[in-house]
Amino acid sequence: MMRRPWLLSALVAWVKLPSVQGEDLFSLGEIDGSLLNGASDACVAAINTKVSCPSTLGLLHFDSDMELDTAEIKELCQGSCLTSLADLRDSVKRTCGSEVTFEDPVSGALWKASYLMEEAIYYAERACLRKGNGQYCNTWFQSAPADASLCDECYKLILWHNAQSPLSEDTSEQKEIYTSASSSCGYKKQPTQTYPPLLVSSPMATPSCSSEYTIKTGDTFLSVSESQRVSTHDLATANRLDSLVSDFPSSGKLCIRNQCDVYVVKSGDTCESIQSENGLSKARLRSWNPFINGYCDNISSYVNQTICISNPLGDYKVPENQDAAGFDTPAAVPDNIAPNTTTNCGLFHNVTAGDDCGTIGLKYSISLDDFIFLNSMIWPNCTNLWLRASYCVAPVGDIADYPGYGPEEDEWTIEPQESTEIAEIPHIGWLNDSRPYVPLANSTREDCWEYLWWNETYAGSPISCREAALGYELDLEQFFLWNPSLDQNEPDAVSPTYDFPCTISPFVSYCMQLASPTPVPKTPRVPPSPRAAGEIANCTRWFMGYFDCASQLSLSRMTMEKMYRYNPSLKEDCSGYTLGTFYCHETLDDLYHYDDALYGDDETSPITSSAPTSTTASSKTSSSAAQPTNVSTDGTCGGAKGKTCLNSAFGDCCSSSGYCGDSLPYCGGGCQSKFGKCDAGSEKISPDGTCGGDKEYTCEGSQFGDCCSQYGYCGRATDNCGKGCQKQYGVCT
């Protein structure tokens, strides 16, 4: 479910929730007076009063539609929680009055003082909605058939609840949706109450214009963008025009700001082609055009629009000292200096949201190599900047005078003689782990795509296991299966439960996501409703239409073409968009056939083989020893227990690291045929990233890349697929 921006910004105000069971005193947020305008000490104390609610209430803040078990529903809905929340809300209204406002620290929006209480009441009431027969809708949704009627009473109750929420800036649209559904389904429309909105004001930035342009006959978004040297997106944003740039005004004046050299995006352009044509790095292209998303897969949305190919904010130079370039004396060392950053530094930069090494280098005119030299904790790919930490961005004096800078110089000379050229040591990309070395928890899976390490320095006290699993959309059974050191059930328990207190450790990391699809849960998740008619098949994730079409496109990081393809009822111009309807934005193809270029080296593109490897059942072979006995029940295989994956719930193939699955990492190179099926020819597919040599491993079809470099390593980068690539052991370009 798509979350509203006010939900995301409100996270700052909520404290981390203790992992407790049952109803207890629960804090909605440790709010100090700095976030409350005009509040007395008594008002601050009232707002920070704890309520008698279970910790489930805090989890609903992250996912208002999370599935609750019977005990959780009973604690939340049949105890004193709702009464306690209502009492606190009324107490805050009496104590604080109508003039006190709560300021959202992220968006700057002002809310009435009772905002946190109303927000919590909304979540609790939504989770406690019940049919006329007494069944809770939360329980009904968990078991409802996929073809359940959209006119079921629970759908009606959800729409009714949304239509009278005081959290909305304007409930009129939700009321229209509820009225329409009541009419089409033929059920009696319950009256909805109208509450005064909680939102007092939302800040509206006033653009700072460097000049104004008077609109002429025949002007278009593109013509004005080109003549005034601004990006089309910024022209629309500065003047609050249609973000789809489909309706240009016929008269008036336009604010012109952030001028730059512009490039008109053509059909077929990619970020890589634009960078190559204009001599730009990806960091510069992205920082000068922040509306291009991190994957650069929405560039086609800006065809026939201008983008910036020079800095729209102007070039920044490090201030020069009158006596010498740079800084003569070290700057004061900040309290939040990053680990392993030199203190002999002329200037520090405090990292804020949106910073990356590209923008920092651009701002302070420092090369990436020099930045890494002064801040040795930074990885070569510079993806581990810490938020709110200070890094050195300028040396004291000449950086070449720093010990260890540059190559060592011999103090003697030798006469040049003929010598044999030594081959360059290969860059083995797959061995260079891009994460900090934090040991895995005991028995945690070692073949995961993503691990979680809780950094106490900036994140505070560790969270509960349930919150960690919820943050990655994992059910608890799956989370504990991958991280068994946290599981408190007896080994081989017949009916394990997961309601025990559990907190993750800040000293180890945990598996949160596999590199390939995980087994389908026993109980399929029921699609949301109402959904758009005629949506694409195999949809796995939806968003609800809360905002206008253009805003929804931006939030979901989809192009209009893709959104229309997934949801034909929208029509090509999005004129069929309906608020309150769920639209598809992710399918099985998105999950199973992701583009390696999105996750790999920024400077590489995916290499496809002319003979794709099939992973269907017909292309797999199994050893005679791999019989459906001693079948794995926990997803592990081989080893001392000798468990087989054949006919298991996790997949028929046993990977080299001893886990069951059905995709390439399990059935390809290194697959253990003694404990399940393997792809035909998998014994020749590289299990460890090496190729050729005595073993004559091939890279094609391996998880490391299809190209075999001249040095005998698999990969997909230019070093592997270009000069010296060994065609007999893989694909070459």
UniProtKB/Swiss-Prot annotation:
GO terms for molecular function: chitin binding. Residues 211-256, 261-309, 347-393 form the LysM domain. Residues 634-680, 688-733 form the Chitin-binding type-1 domain. PROSITE patterns: CHIT_BIND_I_2, LYSM. It is a peripheral membrane protein. It is found in: Secreted; Cell membrane; Vacuole. The keyword Disulfide bond applies. Residues 1-22 form the signal peptide. Secreted effector that enables the plant pathogenic fungus to manipulate host defenses for successful infection. Not involved in host recognition and penetration but suppresses host cell death and promotes fumonisin biosynthesis while the pathogen colonizes maize kernels. This is Non-secreted LysM effector LCP1. It comes from Gibberella moniliformis (strain M3125 / FGSC 7600) (Maize ear and stalk rot fungus). The lineage of its organism: Eukaryota, Fungi, Dikarya, Ascomycota, Pezizomycotina.
